[in-house]
């Protein structure tokens, strides 16, 4: 995955695509920082996907602030950055499939109350790893357990 990011940085430089270039450089910086913090030579794809998801999440939070400040230019730029980063994420799971996985997990642990949410989340997160927004997963589980 890191090789693909590096190759895309080179192609963005050749195409003079400044937005893509800056977004990918920020991503590469975040990956390098995480690699240094973990004291490893190379991160695996799961770690890189987690970093990308974190980058997307922070940009979505920024959009909320930009909307409050009526900054359409920054909203558009940030949405474009999210699109660039999303290209590196695994294909997102459909709501129907996610709902089925949650139902199976609830049955698996015999969850009946909201107190069982942690054990359900543990099972679901291992199955959907990086393919679903965990806030969405959490809200669906809450609805099903209430």
Sequence positions of predicted segments:
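N-terminal cationic and glycine-rich segments that engage phosphates or anionic surfaces
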Residues: 2-88, 92-103, 107-108, 112-114, ...
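Key DNA-contact positions within bacterial/archaeal DNA-binding proteins
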Residues: 135
């Amino acid at each position: 995955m890191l090789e693909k990011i590096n190759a895309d940085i080179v192609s963005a430089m050749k195409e003079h695509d400044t937005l893509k270039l800056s977004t990918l450089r920020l991503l590469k910086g975040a990956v390098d920082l995480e690699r240094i913090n973990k004291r490893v030579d190379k991160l695996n794809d799961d770690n890189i996907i987690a970093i990308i998801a974190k980058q997307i999440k922070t940009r979505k939070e920024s959009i909320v602030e930009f909307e409050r400040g009526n900054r359409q230019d920054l909203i558009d730029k940030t949405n474009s950055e999210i699109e660039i980063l999303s290209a590196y994420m695994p294909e997102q799971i459909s709501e129907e499939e996610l709902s089925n996985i949650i139902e199976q997990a609830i049955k698996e642990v015999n969850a009946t109350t909201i107190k069982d949410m942690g054990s359900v989340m543990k099972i679901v997160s291992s199955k959907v790893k990086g393919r679903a927004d965990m806030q969405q997963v959490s809200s669906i589980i809450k609805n099903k357990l209430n």
